[in-house]
Amino acid sequence: MFLRAVVLTLALVAVTGARAEVSPDQVATVVWDYFSQLSNNAKEAVEHLQQSELTQQLNALFQDKLGQVNTYADNLQKKLVPFATELHERLTKDSEKLKEEIRKELEELRARLLPHANEVSQKIGDNVRELQQRLGPYADELRTQVNTHAEHLRRHLTSHAQRMEAVLRENVDNLQSSLTPYADEFKAKIDQNIEELKGHLTPYADELKVKIDQNVEELRRSLAPYAQDVQEKLNHQLEGLAFQMKKNAEELKAKITANADELRQRLAPVAEDVRSKLRDNAKGLQESLAQLNSHLDRQVEEFRRNLGPYGDTFNRALVQQVEELRQKLGPYAGGMEDHLSFLEKDLRDKVNSFFITLKEKENQDRPLALPEQEQAPGPLES
C-alpha cells in the first residue's frame, strides 16, 4: 500500500542516524509523492485520505524507529509529523484554487502579449537556440568525465586485483595471512573510488543550475518590453519554468548518484567472494581473482554506457520546457495547464522555511559553550 510506503520513507528520512542526512528536499519529496499518488488514485484517496490516520501511523512508526535515540530526533518527530500532515491537507485544498489562479494569470498574459505574438515567439525561439548552444558542451563534458573517471576507477581496482594475484603466486602456502589485508583493502578501495567518482560527477548538475538561471534571466529581459503591465505575472511564469528546469538538474544528480551506488553494489559481492575463498585452495582463489578482473570490466563499461547519454536527455528536457512556455504564452495555447509545478514549488519553499526556522530555534536554545581556560604562563627563564 502506497500510504504505508510513504510513511515508512518519511520515518526513515528522520532517523537515518546523522542529522546532515535529514534534508528539506527529502521531506518535501515524500509529501509531494504522497499527494501525487492520491491525486492519481481516487479509490485510495477516498479510503486513506484521513488526516488522523496519517498522523497516527506517522507517530507509531516514528516511535517504533526512534525509541530513545536522542533529543534532536525526538524534537524532529514532534515538529515534523504535524507539519507534514498539515502540508498535505493544504496541498489538497489549494490545488483547485491555484489551478484557477494560474489559468487567469495565463489568460491575462496572453491577452497582453497577443499584439506582439510573433516577436514573443521569436524571442523565445532565440532563447531556445542559445540554451542548446550553452548546454551542448556540458553534455559532451559529462560524457567525457564519465568515461575518464570510470576508466580511472577500473584501472585503480584492476591494479589492486593484479597485486593480489602476484601475492597469491608468491604465498601459495600461506594464503589467508598474506592476502587478507589486500582483500580488506580492496573492499575499502571500492567504496573510496565510488565516492570519488560521485564527487567528480555530481557538481556537473550544480553548474547546470547556474546556466539555467542565466538563461531564464535573459529570457525575462528579452520579453520584458512586451509585458510592461503584466511583468509580475510573467516573472511568476518564469519562476515556474526555472523550478522545472532545476528539478531536472536535481534528477540528473540523483541518477548519477544512483548509478554510482549501483556500481558499488555490483562490485562488492565479487570482492567478498574473493575474501571468502581465502580459506579454500589456491586454484579456487585464482579463479575468483580472474573473475574479478572480467567483472570489473563489464560493470564499469555498463556504468559508462548507462550514464553517458544522460546529459543529452537532460538537454532535450530543458529545451522542451522552454518550448512549452512558448506554447502557453502563444495565441493557440488551448487548455495547457501547469499549476501542479507551482504547487510543488510552493510546497518545497514551505518545507525549506520550516527547516530554517527549526534550525534557528535550535541554535537559540543551545547553551553557549564556555570559553576554554587559558593556561597560566610558565615562569620566566632567568
UniProtKB/Swiss-Prot annotation:
GO terms for molecular function: cholesterol transfer activity; phosphatidylcholine-sterol O-acyltransferase activator activity; phospholipid binding. Residues 1-20 form the signal peptide. It comes from the Eukaryota. Sequence repeats lie at residues 33-54, 60-81, 82-103, 115-136, 137-158, 159-180, 181-202, 203-224, 225-246, 247-268, 269-286, 287-308, 309-330. Residues 33-330 are annotated as: 13 X 22 AA approximate tandem repeats. InterPro entries: ApoA_E, Apolipoprotein_A1/A4/E. The keyword Transport applies. SUPFAM superfamilies: Apolipoprotein A-I. One of its GO terms (biological process) is cholesterol efflux. Keywords: Chylomicron, HDL, Lipid transport, Repeat, Secreted, Signal, Transport. Residues 362-382 are annotated as: Disordered. PANTHER family: APOLIPOPROTEIN, APOLIPOPROTEIN A-IV. May have a role in chylomicrons and VLDL secretion and catabolism. Required for efficient activation of lipoprotein lipase by ApoC-II; potent activator of LCAT. Apoa-IV is a major component of HDL and chylomicrons. Belongs to the apolipoprotein A1/A4/E family. This is Apolipoprotein A-IV. It comes from Felis catus (Cat). The lineage of its organism: Eukaryota, Metazoa, Chordata, Craniata, Vertebrata.
